[in-house]
Each structure stands twice: as C-alpha cells, then as structure tokens.
Amino acid sequence: MADNKINLDNLNMSEEELFSRISNDELSSEKITAPRYSYWQSVFRVFFRNKINVVMLSLLAIIIIFSFIYPAVIGYDAMVDPFINVMDSTAKHLKPAAAMEKFGANIHWILGAGASGESTFDAIWYGSSISISLALICAVINMTIGVVLGAVWGFSKKFDIFMTEVYNVVANVPYILLISVIVLIMTPNFWSMVFALTITGWIGVAYFIRTQVIIIRDREYNLASRCLGTPIGRIATKNILPFMTSVIVTLAATEIPSYISYEVFLSYIGMGLSDMSLGKLIEAAKSAMQTPGWEIEFWSPVAVASIITVVLYVVGQNLGDASDPRTHMS
C-alpha cells in the first residue's frame, strides 16, 4: 500500500504560510453554523414531495376557481338566474345537446338545463360555493371551540368530571336527528344550518383533543418539566402544542368533508338549505328521474360533491401527516 502521508518539506512553504493562528473568540464559538430549522418549511417540503398532493391541490384550485370566482365573473344572481326560464316549459330538463340547440353552444349549457330551465353547469358551481362555505364556517367554529375546551378538559381534573358528564349526555343524542329537529324548528336557511351543525358538533372534537392532551401531558419530559416548576402555559405551548398540530390538521380534514356530506344528505331528504346548494340541486333533480337523460342532471352534482369531499379529505390527511414532526427526520 502506498504511503499517503504528505511530506511538508517538499512543499517549499514556511510554517507561517502553512498554518495560521485562530483567535479564541468566545462569541464566534457560540454561533450555530447549521442551517436554521423552519417547522412549516419542513412541513411543506414533506407535503409537496408526494406527487399525489400536487395533483390534489391542482384539483382543489380548480374547484375554488369555479366555485367562487366563476359565478362572480359571469355575474350569477341566485335570485334571478335559476328562474329566468321557469315559465318556458320547453326549457326544463334538457340534455346538453338540446340545451345548446335552444340557448346556443357555450360553456353554460354543457351539462344541460335543470328543473327550472336554469344552466346546470352554473348552478352546480354556485351551489358548490354555498356548500363549501357552510362546511368551512362550521369546521372553524367546531374546531375552535373543540380545541380550546378539549385542551382545558385534558389539563383540568375538575373540569374533566363536568365535561365527561356533558359528553355522555350529548353523545347519546343522534346527531342527524338533532340537526333535523333544529332545522324544522328554525327557518331553513344558511345560518340556521350553521347553528344546527355547530350546537353540539364541537363535543366530539373536544373529547378527541382531551384524549390526545392527556396522552402527551403524562409523558416523562412533561412530568419532569412540572417537577422543575415550569409553568403550565409554557408546557402547553412548547411541549404539547407542536405534537398537537398534526392531530388538529388531520381532524379538520375529516370535519370539512363531513359537513358537506351532512348538507347534501339533509337537502336531499328535503330538510336542508332553502338556498341553492349541491344538496338542493340533487334534491331538485329527483323530479327529472322520469324524463329522458335525467342521468346528467342528477349525477353531475353528485359527482362534484364527491370530488370535493375526496379532494379535501386527501389534502387534509396528507397535510396532517406532513405536520407530524416525526416525518421531518430526513
């Protein structure tokens, strides 16, 4: 084996040229040369590493554009447009080809005409904006109340006794039945539906958060922090909250699609919104089942509602997985 050692005499350099003295700077020695860690940068790096997430986000962007921007661009008026052809009996329940022949070949009639002679395509996207807005508002309210009360529930033993009894009572009341009764008592509009979906919707979130807080609260490092006199607030923000982020995101991923499903189901059985929504469109399309070509009018809003719920669920679940600090090791 060849000798890999370097002979300094052969370099023809003085000792001063070969070596230089480094000053003992205490401040410099304290500096961390490693790149600064950013939690959310790491989250999105892990999230976008999965190509499926990119596809799902693209679909979500298209859904948002057509649900919220498209109706505003075309000037869709929910009080006028759905009834513009209501007096024309020949404009109702038309297939796409018949609708384009009657009204002109454009994007508005690619899914035909509905029960009132309205554009099914335009109505679906306006209805999507109503359903998505309802789901987002309900999710924000229930998640906010549920996370706050769940955290207190998990920390306070006195509050735990009271809330456990409340949970045992509320959890035994059928959720759909409670929503239906509230909607029947109140005027069936957007905000009454929000009230019905949030009056007890937070209790399940709070119970789940309470369970997670108890699990993390009793870990060894948290017990050691409490023994050392660390304030509860600091333990909650530094030791518990970072581990709860992925749990909260994952829980929200199931909450938002579930409220869209509730709205569609309640509207389909005639107990939902009075405003146009995906459920209302599906309920109105039932009357077209005896007419030729009813499949497009009925299954179009069903397909859009299904795509929206699946996309929101997949994006939320994968974002929740990416939020888990254990996935940031690599």
Predicted regions and their residues:
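Glycine-rich helix-loop "coupling/hinge" segments at transmembrane-helix boundaries
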Residues: 184-186, 213, 261-304, 328
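Alpha-helical transmembrane segments
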Residues: 202, 206, 255, 259, ...
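Transmembrane alpha-helix boundary and packing residues in multipass membrane permease domains
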Residues: 63, 151, 180-184, 193, ...
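Gly/Trp-centered helix-boundary motif
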Residues: 1-143, 147, 151, 158, ...
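Transmembrane alpha-helices
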Residues: 129-145, 233-263
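Short helix-to-coil transition segments within interhelical loops
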Residues: 113-118, 156, 224-234, 238-243
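Membrane-helix/interface signature in polytopic inner-membrane proteins
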Residues: 207-226, 232
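Generic hydrophobic transmembrane alpha-helix motif, especially the helices
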Residues: 110, 141, 146, 151-215, ...
